[in-house]
Amino acid sequence: MDTSLAEEVQQTMATLAPNRFFFMSPYRSFTTSGCFARFDEPAVNGDSPDSPFQQKLAALFADAKAQGIKNPVMVGAIPFDPRQPSSLYIPESWQSFSRQEKQASARRFTRSQSLNVVERQAIPEQTTFEQMVARAAALTATPQVDKVVLSRLIDITTDAAIDSGVLLERLIAQNPVSYNFHVPLADGGVLLGASPELLLRKDGERFSSIPLAGSARRQPDEVLDREAGNRLLASEKDRHEHELVTQAMKEVLRERSSELHVPSSPQLITTPTLWHLATPFEGKANSQENALTLACLLHPTPALSGFPHQAATQVIAELEPFDRELFGGIVGWCDSEGNGEWVVTIRCAKLRENQVRLFAGAGIVPASSPLGEWRETGVKLSTMLNVFGLH
């Protein structure tokens, strides 16, 4: 295939180097420099302070402080399956920046990179994906499982290496209020994305989470767009899917917090392409918790795997023809004081030289339509396709 991939972006500052971590959120936005130590310990059982993951994390923070790093942070990504190696590291230093100023500078960015797509492949193809959805929907109508999240990929090969810093600027310009991230990986690649979903933020003893489940495509007409949002809010199918997520999260968080506040009904939030049902959680964590114990407790939520978790992940393993790896995982940071912020690794891409892999998923329940879920994942993929100029 010989598709044009032109980047019409604006530059006011140098782009981020591919070996630097970048995280932009309403709570804290920062970049990092250098690498003190990589940390690939699997996050399995990471919700326990006594787990190997948490014990080794604490030891690494102590080492960093002993070497003169005053306020060490652990940054990076944890895969969908926490039994797999983590992609985390402690940088030598970090630098805060203004989210508002970065939003403005990204809109003014003028540097361009022209690339050609030489190959583009959907994994799986549409017919196979729709068969997967039909099978999963049938299973969710049985006592075995209530919800399954199925995903698909797009692999793209370009004629030259891709500048992740240029893409990051365009991603921010197009998705200014998302949780934007750029994660350097040990293999030389980069995980880049604009997540709409906060898994866990912890500041002192207070924590928050805003799970998303249930979505609808935005419309260009303002009246039709609002109608689409209202239909989503009234959708029995989407409300059921959303409630499976929030109920599961409430059950596990109650035991780990002295306070927990959860609205009885979801609200609407938007991205440039989608409406989402969202429920904001607020709470006060027990004293032994840190941002990563709580993030690992929740991850993966039923919004990324399904419910019940074990049955849903078994269906995913049987139906999806690929390993999700970091997709559907979590991205963020945690400091040595237990504060941190972790978002769900969606609306994202993995880049390495001239190779790109995009990811999107959808929650499957008995009322799911195979064609409808193909289209929904297509809208979700459009977030990153738009960044590449492939509408």
From Swiss-Prot:
Reported induction: Under conditions of iron deficiency and by the fur protein.
Effect of residue 303 to T: Loss of mutase activity
Class of enzymatic activity (EC top level): isomerase
Pathway(s) annotated for this protein in UniProt: Siderophore biosynthesis; enterobactin biosynthesis
Phenotype for residue 304 to A: Loss of mutase activity
Molecular function GO terms recorded: isochorismate synthase activity; magnesium ion binding
Binding site for Mg(2+) 1: 140, 142, 145-146
This protein's record includes keyword Isomerase: yes
Disruption phenotype: Cells lacking this gene are unable to produce enterobactin and are hypersensitive to the antimicrobial peptide wrwycr.
Cofactor(s), names only, from the UniProt record: Mg(2+)
Active site per database record: 147 (proton acceptor), 197 (proton donor)
Catalytic reaction list: chorismate = isochorismate
SUPFAM superfamilies per UniProt: ADC synthase
Residues annotated to bind isochorismate: 214-215, 241, 303, 347, 361, 380
EC number(s) reported in the record: 5.4.4.2
Listed InterPro entries: ADC_synthase, Chorismate_C, IsoChor_synthase
Keyword Metal-binding: yes
Protein function: Involved in the biosynthesis of the siderophore enterobactin (macrocyclic trimeric lactone of N-(2,3-dihydroxybenzoyl)-serine). Catalyzes the reversible conversion of chorismate to isochorismate.
Subunit structure, as described in the record: Monomer. Forms a specific pairwise interaction with EntB; this interaction likely facilitates substrate channeling to connect the EntB and EntC active sites.
UniProt record similarity statement: Belongs to the isochorismate synthase family.
Protein name listed in UniProt: Isochorismate synthase EntC
Organism expressing this protein natively: Escherichia coli (strain K12)
